[in-house]
Structures are given as C-alpha cells and as structure tokens.
Amino acid sequence: MAGEFVNLYSKWRGINRFPALLMMFDLLAEWDAPMARGISLPDVPNLRHWAQTETKLGNPALKAYCAAHSIDEMPDMHQALEWSVAVNKSVEEVVQGGLPPFPYVRECLEKAQALADMMVCSQTPGEALEREWAEQDMDKYVFTINGQEVGTKSEHIQFASDGRYDRTKILMIGDANGDLKAARNNQALFFPINPGEEEASWKRLFDEGLDRFFAGTYAGDYEASLIAEFEKFLPTTPPWKK
C-alpha cells in the first residue's frame, strides 16, 4: 500500500523508481501497523547517497557503480540493482503484446503532429518506453523517446528546447507533479492528465486543450484552472495517517 501511494496516488507519482523506493521505506518506518508486526526494513545508506547525487538514475549508472564496488563494500547497491533488473523483467512480461493507450491519446498525437514536434519525457527505462511505443505504433509521432538514463524530465525538456523554441510554445502533458515541475523549471506550459480520470482528460485535450495551445490562448486562467483541479488528485498525506 505504501508503494502504491507513492507511485500512483500521491504528488510523488511518476518519480524515478529509486527515490520512490526510498520514500516507501520511510513511509513504512513511520507506519505503526506494519512496524508492530515486526517488519524489518533494509538499511540502504549507499543507495540513499547515490539517489541524491547521481544525475542519471537508471540501471546503466547503477551497474557501473556496482562494477566499481564489490557486494561486500556496497551490499545495498547490489541488492538495488538486482531488484531493478527484476522490475524491468516483470514489466516486460506484464505488458507483453502491448497495452493499448487510453482513448483519445492516439487522436491527440495525430492532431498535434502536423503543428508540433513531440517527444517522450519519462523516468521509465528507455528500453521499455521504446518497446511499448513501438508495439502500439505510436513511436512514429515523436522525434525522440527519453527515459531515465537521459536525465530528469526537466533536463529532457531543456536539452530539446534550448535555442529552438519560444517557452510559451512548449506544452508538457503529464499525470504527475514531477511533470508539472519539469514544465515550470523550463517556463513551459502544462496540461494535466488527472489520475483516475485519464480518458476525460485526454478527451479535453483533444476537444479544447490543443486548439487553445496552438491558438495562443492556453496560458493564464485556462491553464491555472486545470492545474488547480489536478492538484486535488495528488495528496501528500497517506490515508493511514488521516
């Protein structure tokens, strides 16, 4: 439940898996019910330091770190790598054959393609992103697919836009607070996909959001109203603390 809260039902949804893992440990440590049952949480000081200092939080960087440090030196790092590799394998098995996108996703991409350059910004491993977008024949709509190995979402936008686009002509579409922060860090606009109401959000983007963006009437009250609604879907307090 702590993992689901962090990754799906809180303002931290969409963050990189390693900070999310650490946050889950911290929430469990403060939760009386599981602690009363004698749960033993792993001691991960090296992983904490790495997650705070590494700029490309992904398996390639973690593999390089583990190659330079033995399992006796850094047992938590080697365990984290084993876990992360297993996560990738599990995801590949779960989505084998392809999970179709929400209704109106493809329609939005087709509508925007004629007027915009589009790319993927994600903290999912790049290999999984490329495979899943290709399985749905949606990679043809974007000029690049950026995963966790490339850097943060803010860096993805910065790398692609610096010196190329006016900031008022950049729109980040996302379902997490990290997506909103990435947009704001680059003075870009943001269209929220509300968690749990994805289909309605994509329909709104198709029906009105894209038209407003391309017409130059998106910024201001319209965007602010969408973000105010979006933030209500992202609590900071887990349900067991209420």
Sequence positions of predicted segments:
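C-terminal cap/substrate-recognition subdomain and adjoining C-terminal extension
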Residues: Q96-D117, T124-K242
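Alpha-helical substrate-recognition element adjacent to the catalytic core
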Residues: M1-E127
